[in-house]
Each structure stands twice: as structure tokens, then as C-alpha cells.
Amino acid sequence: TNYCNLQSCKRNNAIHTMCQYTSPTPGPMCLEYSNVGFTDAEKDAIVNKHNELRQRVASGKEMRGTNGPQPPAVKMPNLTWDPELATIAQRWANQCTFEHDACRNVERFAVGQNIAATSSSGKNKSTLSDMILLWYNEVKDFDNRWISSFPSDGNILMHVGHYTQIVWAKTKKIGCGRIMFKEDNWNKHYLVCNYGPAGNVLGAQIYEIKK
């Protein structure tokens, strides 16, 4: 893929991460970096954690929410690891900038993103599972009336958007990147996960509720 020519980025006048950052080496913001990327076991752990959480919701076992428990889903297929999404996520993680990148789409589909960072004055012991749970636990602020149509209120997206991307039924693929680095004497652990097809489509159904 020529990422610099991707129409889905151009439509938004956005530069693709792989076009903007051509070097696979961590960028100038990444001081004393380590733990770039994942072992195969860690990749499996990320996928398995996501699928465990998807199945928790799909089977009606998530009791939290502002308006009562989360209803079960007709279907919420398991996610599988996607190397292309992972390469793009890692390239962005390697910039050590805690924000969303401008464009991370692929030829196949639009791509969504969750990011998390933890800081520690000593050794950073936060696990990948801990960070995924930071996203998922937004379910406590999620109103189950939003399932049939994702709200277009940006404020809502800010508070529950990580959770909704995790349980978005039409998302099939995940690929993540990670780096640890130092920033102002803090030991940072930065995780970027890219999801395709992207979730959090305004007005779209998050998942079909099982009656």
C-alpha cells in the first residue's frame, strides 16, 4: 500500500502515520526507550483479553452501566491480530506522543484507535491487561440506550469511546504497538491499539441486542 496516497486520508486532508513517519526507529521524544513492540505471547494476551471482555458483554454478564446492566448481543465475533494494523500502531507509539494520530486507515477499511499511558516514578509495572481494563471500565459511565445508535455528542465519546470500540460488533481485527520511555523522570508505558473496521461510527449500532 502506498500510504501517502490513501484516499480515505486525503478526504480528511490528513497525512497517514506511515507516510509522515518513515523511520521504524523511535522518534526524538522517546528518551531511554525500551520494550518496543510485543512478544507473541503478549500479542495473544492482548487479543485474548479483548475477546474475554467482548464475550462478557455479549453473554449479558456485564452488570455495570449508568442505566443498569449491559444487554447481551446477538453476535460479537472474536477479534484476530492483524500485522498491518500492528505495524501502523507501533509506528505511532514510536513517536511517544500521547494523542491520536491523524490517519491510520488501510486499503481494506477505516481504522479506529484506543490509546493508554501509565506513569511511574519507579519501575513501571502496569500490565497490558491493566491498560485494556482502563478502557473497558468506562462501561460504568455507559448508558445502554446508546447501543442502538452511537451518540454524536463528543463529550459522550470522550467518556465511553474506548469501551465502545472494544465491544463494537463489526470490528474484526486488532493490531497494537507499545513502547516504554522516560519523560520528566517518569517511567512511561504507552499502548496504542488500532481496530478495523473502525468502531464509534456516529449514529451506527454498536451491537445488535439479543432479545
Curated annotation (Swiss-Prot):
**Subcellular location, record wording:** Secreted
Keyword Disulfide bond recorded = yes
**Keyword tags:** Allergen, Disulfide bond, Secreted
Top-level lineage group: Eukaryota
Q: Where is the SCP domain?
A: 47-195
Query: Which residues lie within the region annotated Disordered?
Result: 58-77
PANTHER family membership: CYSTEINE-RICH SECRETORY PROTEIN-RELATED
In the record, the note on similarity to other proteins reads: Belongs to the CRISP family.
Name it.
Venom allergen 3
What's the source species for this entry?
A: Solenopsis richteri (Black imported fire ant)
